[in-house]
Every structure is written in C-alpha cells, then in structure tokens.
Regions:
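Generic short beta-strand segments
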Residues: 154-156
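N-terminal onset of structured domains
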Residues: 2-131, 135-136, 141-142, 146-150, ...
C-alpha cells in the first residue's frame, strides 16, 4: 500500500510538471543547439576536409541547387554552392547525423543534433559565416527566384566539438522546412592528431 501511495505521488508530480512546462517548440530548441555550437573551440585535432555532395533536393521548394567541391590549391578543397528557391523561406532547420568509417563502411556514430540554419550562419558554427565572404549570399532570409551563390567555403576546424576520436567521418545533413525535406547533403572528412604538437 505504501508503494502504491509513493507511486501515485510520483506520477502526480510528473503530471503537474508536464502541465506547467508545455512541450518546447522544435525551432526554439534548434536555436539553443546553435547557441551551444558557438561555444565549441578546440585545438586538439586537425580536420582534413574532403568533399560535400548533394544527395537529393525537393523541386517544390528549390528550382536549382548545385554543390561543387574543387581544389582551391594543392592542399585545400573548397565548396561552391549555387541555389534558387521557389518560395520565400525565412529560416529552416538542419538535422545533422554523423557516421564513422569502420569495417569498410560508414556506421552510425553517436553524434546527432538539429539546429537553425540562419542561427548557425549568424553565429558561425563550424565556420558557416564565411559563406557570406564570397559570392552574392548575404545571409538570411532565403528569397524566392533570386539566383544565389556562395563560393570558396571550407569548414573551420577550430569551431568543431572537442575530443572527437580519430577516423574518417561522413556527416549527413538533412534540411527541413516545417515537415518538408528541402535537401540532403553528405560531407566527408578525416580527423587526426598531429604526432608532434607545436
């Protein structure tokens, strides 16, 4: 009987706290994640960026989307992106899932988060602010029927989370507006630690 009373009291506390704190808005949570990502600063490892590829895009929202990776010089690959939206988008979310290359395939790695794209660009998460340095992209919002280009972008390794293990990684980045998938990208890179630290 005592166990039942304790259980009933515990469930009452949970029900009361659920009513007092309604379910958070996913877009607000995405903004919180991009705020957390701005706190990342590391010099523990080096990031060898390889490429970004476009998997698919939704032609109801995008009239054009091209992603091209090329060598800026002998050692630095960079990405050029060209797009034209078919509708005005004030902001949308990115769902990022990491995969690590083991046993001759990319396997699920326990790193997954969702963030606001405009918030990530504004706070320069992973160096995204440099998208506005080359081309005619000036930031959010994303406007309808405006051909936009961002060029010579590469990730900033100092703005990544610390203590990620060495290895080859793939990030699958799914862009979502409300309940619709806009496009999916895959980014490939390697993480390594230098033998000699400076």
């Amino acid at each position: 009987m005592i166990v039942f009373k304790v259980f009933a009291a515990y469930m009452g506390v949970i029900a009361t706290s659920a009513v007092a704190h309604p379910a958070p808005n996913n877009h607000q949570d995405a903004g919180l994640v991009s705020d957390i990502l701005t706190k990342f600063h590391q010099n523990d490892y080096k990031l060898k960026f390889e490429r970004v590829e476009l998997v698919r895009f939704n032609k109801q929202y995008l009239k054009k989307l091209e992603v091209v990776t090329y060598k800026y010089n002998r050692t630095s690959p960079v990405v050029n992106v060209t797009w034209m939206y078919g509708t005005d988008l004030p902001d949308y979310d990115a769902v990022v899932q990491a995969y690590r290359f083991t046993s001759n395939e990319y396997r699920l790695f326990p790193l997954r988060f969702q963030m606001s794209v405009c918030g990530a660009i504004k706070t320069s998460a992973a160096g995204l602010q440099t998208l506005t340095h080359c081309g005619n992209f000036t930031g959010c919002p994303f406007l309808k029927d405006v051909p936009t280009r961002a060029c010579n972008w590469s990730p900033d390794e100092t703005r990544f989370p610390p203590f990620i293990p060495d290895g080859e990684y793939m990030l699958e980045i799914q862009m979502i507006f409300r309940n619709a998938e806009l496009y999916v990208l895959r980014a490939y890179s390697s993480i390594y630690r230098p033998i000699v630290k400076k």
